[in-house]
Amino acid sequence: MAAEQDPEGRAAARPLLTDLYQATMALGYWRAGRAQDQAEFELFFRQCPFGGAFALAAGLRDCVRFLRAFRLRDADVQFLASALPPDTDPAFFEHLRALDCSGVTVRALPEGSLAFPGVPLLQVSGPLLVVQLLETPLLCLVSYASLIATNAARLRLIAGPDKRLLEMGLRRAQGPDGGLTASTYSYLGGFDASSNVLAGQLRGVPVAGTLAHSFVTSFSGSEVPPDPMLAPAAGQGSQVDLAASVEMWLERVCGHLGLGVQEPHRGERAAFVAYALAFPRAFQGLLDTYSVRRSGLPNFLAVALALQELGYQAVGVRLDSGDLLQQAREIRGVFRTAAAQFGVPWLQSVPIAVSNNIDEEELARLAQKGSEVNVIGIGTSVVTCPRQPSLGCVYKLVSVGGQPRMKLTEDPEKQTLPGSKAAFRLLGSDGSLLLDVLQLAEEPPPQAGQELRVWPRGARESRTVRPAHVEPLLRLWVQQGQLCEPLPSLAESRAFAQQSLHRLSPAHRRLEQPALYQVALSEKLQALVDRLSARGAL
């Protein structure tokens, strides 16, 4: 198995959740006497996902948990011994048994940070053999989490701040751990809640859900509730037979809607009554099992008005098929006339929830001005990221023994930036984001108000910039295996992500054909790149 339960109960990465060549390289390092050489790797992506201009950094908490628990068990070492050549020196396996991350240091963007191509999400330094073994698990933990968070952020930007977004993609996710990761990081990216109960238990994600069509169709209308009596919400007064009250209200509702009392489906009405008896303070009707206009809507109104007499207020309706936008408008119109007809003002503002394979295009339609939709449930489109299934993060060596290392290639996009680095975000006087700058770690940081010459990546010429504010991007989270500061909670990271997105200019937030955000190199870093490139590098 590739996963075990961590203290939170979540499926956690284990050391052998890796590619075999990490183990073969580890043997090579050990055999060459280089296992303890101090090395630094950077984890980053080369292009923003989904054709956009930004990404959100995520997965740090999972990485820290993995590093702190990193240890090869006897069974792990025995398996590696079976996978490596039979004449491998047994001393190598004893070395593996003693490995941990006590010598590892991690700097990273806080979760929820805006991230741009080439800027490290993580910097990982420590003994060469160990930090090499960390490559695949860290990529696995960061790439999907960041992709999901970014996808969720895009959907939130489309929906706007007022629509309630529910993630309901567990049944469509790529396996149990993929489902849990998607629920966790869609919440970080801006969704309000998830249908995933385990995400609520383990990660503190707010959970939401009501009923499915199977609940409605399981009732025929001949069922007699074992106890149809319901007490008033205030707790005082006589109990009322809710089923009988609903039948009385149905006549009035059908008269208002111009329907015969036989038209609404009896089984659907029985299902609504059963659900209302179980959840009188949280009754929601699923309207489209049979006919929204002739059945679901009148049955819902009859139950909602019967509950109203007892002091309860229905919390909403849901649609799962058809033209969601048009149906929502029609339903809102009925709610308004019914509110006036029956003297129940709150009825006109009952929340309308929709779901049904909603993607970015349909979401934009549902979020347009004049839409009567209040709550939107999204499954497949958030958890599977159909527009781009992978962020394409990489983990590249940048220094060994304090000496810079650089990968040269005929593809300029795949060249790496050498040396241990610092990253800064430069801002204008109004707080607007100007650019991110990468520089060598030994360089003094940029100063607010001082002119700085930088080399934008991909440009042939340098430019000067005078920032009004300078923000360091990479924070020290783990030093020599020890946590340096408490990690923010998921809710705190979610709030930080929304703050980060609001700082982006509209041109950079634009989801189609956005203006690209600039990442630049300091003069000293650019000179190092040029020097290593000219001499063939390593």
From Swiss-Prot:
Keywords: Cytoplasm, Ligase, Magnesium, Manganese, Metal-binding, Phosphoprotein, Pyridine nucleotide biosynthesis, Transferase
GO molecular function, one term: nicotinate phosphoribosyltransferase activity
Residue numbers binding 5-phospho-alpha-D-ribose 1-diphosphate: T380
Organism annotation: Bos taurus (Bovine)
Quaternary structure, from the entry: Homodimer.
Pathway where this protein functions: Cofactor biosynthesis; NAD(+) biosynthesis; nicotinate D-ribonucleotide from nicotinate: step 1/1
Residues modified to Phosphohistidine: H213
Disulfide bonding pattern of the chain: none
Binding site for nicotinate: Y21, T210, R318
Cofactors, names only: Mg(2+); Mn(2+)
Similarity annotation: Belongs to the NAPRTase family.
One Pfam family named in its UniProt record: NAPRTase_C
Function: Catalyzes the first step in the biosynthesis of NAD from nicotinic acid, the ATP-dependent synthesis of beta-nicotinate D-ribonucleotide from nicotinate and 5-phospho-D-ribose 1-phosphate. Helps prevent cellular oxidative stress via its role in NAD biosynthesis.
Classification via InterPro entries: Aldolase_TIM, NAPRTase_C, NAPRTase_N, Nic_PRibTrfase-Fam, Nic_PRibTrfase_pncB, Nicotinate_pribotase-like_C
Protein name as catalogued: Nicotinate phosphoribosyltransferase
Cofactor binding notes: Activity is highest with Mn(2+).
Protein's cellular compartments: Cytoplasm, Cytosol
PTMs per UniProt: Transiently phosphorylated on a His residue during the reaction cycle. Phosphorylation strongly increases the affinity for substrates and increases the rate of nicotinate D-ribonucleotide production. Dephosphorylation regenerates the low-affinity form of the enzyme, leading to product release.
Reaction(s) catalysed by this chain's protein: nicotinate + 5-phospho-alpha-D-ribose 1-diphosphate + ATP + H2O = nicotinate beta-D-ribonucleotide + ADP + phosphate + diphosphate
GO cellular component assignments: cytosol
UniProt EC number: 6.3.4.21
GO biological process: NAD biosynthetic process via the salvage pathway
Name of the gene encoding the protein in the UniProt record: NAPRT
Highest taxon, organism lineage: Eukaryota
